[in-house]
Amino acid sequence: MFSRFPFRISFLAIVIPGCACLNGTTALGEWRTTQINEMSYVPLGEVAEAFAMKPTKRRKEPREIGFAGETHQLVVKTGTREVIVDGVRHWLSFPVATRGGQAFVTLADINATMGPAMSPAAVKQIGKVKTVVLDPGHGGHDRGGKSAYGYEKDYTLDVVNRTRRILESKKVKVVQSRLSDSFIPLSDRPKMTKNYDKPIFVSIHFNSAEWRPSASGIEVYVLPPLGFPISGKAPDPILDRQKCEGNAIEPASFVLANTMHHTLLGKTGGLDRGVKRARYAVLRYSNDPSILIACAFLTNAQEAKNI
């Protein structure tokens, strides 16, 4: 049952051995800003020019605006948070605005998402990953989602066990948050990185959408920067400003998420659901670069069968 979905046996092993672990803040230079809805926005054309891109003529819909260059491609939809950077979908924290026939993106989103996605070197590099902490989601009494073939907690453990064997064969140090069908408190899982050298934390899950059985694809979650909303939700003046340990390493976590997602899509052919922002406990309580991967949908008949 487990061998038909290539994602299950190789996804982390493909990405992690050569992955650089990044930390710090972006350094993308100065931008000319305009105040829109009490926020600092930057003309999208100037962002494109800074990354050596020019406007493209092709549009799939009226709100779509595209840019391309030798190195980068950028597509946005005005009035939405959706943006495609170098072929990978991302969800901005604030909508793309228009004024006077121009499109604008927030300075915050340039610094937190678009800039690091196109120029990860602008985030201070601290060296290659030396330890991978793999977290099989759920466990014990927490069964997670369910397909016609089994529970999420069993699938996540299987993915991690297979991945661990492959990574260890490549001389990568691997630590697992759980080795059996047991429940580990969510806040304890990311803390397992503290005893290891240059670690990353990767939590493995599968998606469910009983109300929409056709939903499919792969998405990777990372913590939003302090003061930013989560994907798909309006800004919350209280929750968005609550500090957590993961805020300090968010830039590094984002670069890890972007790198991982880009490679997963290329190797598995899965539907791109994007790099998204969320405040899951395993991301909030982390002191090292951390992401959560939702591999596929247990509630999608074809994906569940392949899993």
Annotate each PLM feature:
Residues 2, 21-141, 145-148, 158, ...:
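Primary recognition of N-terminal secretory signal peptides and signal-anchoring hydrophobic helices
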Residues 8, 19, 237-239:
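Intrinsically disordered, low-complexity segments enriched in proline/serine/threonine
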